[in-house]
Structures are given as structure tokens and as C-alpha cells.
């Protein structure tokens, strides 16, 4: 089963920007990877909840 989570890249690290993202229903995050540059992203809370509901099922 493939699960897709839509995320948008963010470039601003300011606290005020993070507050604005949260107040608009977003969740700021950072993607880490081996031999890959870190990426600052954000997802909507509704989208994340949807993915967790769909992917959280047991067989």
C-alpha cells in the first residue's frame, strides 16, 4: 500500500513564520536523511491526520 503525504517546502526559520504556519493549521517539520541535505517542510494537520488514519490500520 502506498501512502502519499503532500508537503510544501519552507525557507524561513523565523519563529514568527512557524507561529503563522501553526495558526493556519500547518505543522512545521524537518526531513533528515543520510548523505542528503536537510529539508524544512510543512504539512497541513488535516492531511497528516488523514494519512495516519489510513496508514494506521492493522491487518
UniProtKB/Swiss-Prot annotation:
GO terms for cellular component: ribonucleoprotein complex; ribosome. Keywords: Ribonucleoprotein, Ribosomal protein. GO terms for biological process: translation. The keyword Cytoplasm does not apply. Gene3D superfamilies: Ribosomal Protein L25, Chain P. The keyword Ribosomal protein applies. GO terms for molecular function: structural constituent of ribosome. Belongs to the bacterial ribosomal protein bL25 family. This is Large ribosomal subunit protein bL25. It comes from Bacillus caldolyticus. The gene is ctc.
